Amino acid sequence: MKKNPIKPRDTEFLTVAPFPCFNYRVYIIFTDSVEKTANSLVSQGLLKNPHEVDDATRAFTVKMPNQSFVVLVYPYDVDISELTHEAYHAVCCMFKWIGASHEEELLSYILGYLCKIVADDRKAMAKKLEKTT
């Protein structure tokens, strides 16, 4: 198992969606502030500065060139369109990593699988958040 490259802030929930058949991982961060998370990722060397993430940004994807992972950052209250939009970026990054062409059916299955993982992780995060408040 590879070491986790991300150190989450105290107000972040970090999960991972592994794709072992592609030697690829999608890290998922749910946060109270996407802007603070962006700054944290800059300090960890995972995001370039300036990063263009501000208080109007709802969610974003950190694309890691020549790396076997991508990072999705979502607010606690992410909606399905934001969830799917960023997950699509992650799947496209994974396809580039494995050298696959944009094959519609395969991409659709993997996107659906990843969105289900993110949605399930969001529900689990919401339950944890409920217990702490």
State where each predicted segment sits.
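Active-site scaffold of zinc-dependent metalloenzymes
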Residues: 35-78, 90
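Generic hydrophobic, helix-prone segments enriched in Leu/Val/Ile
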Residues: 28, 41, 90-95, 110, ...
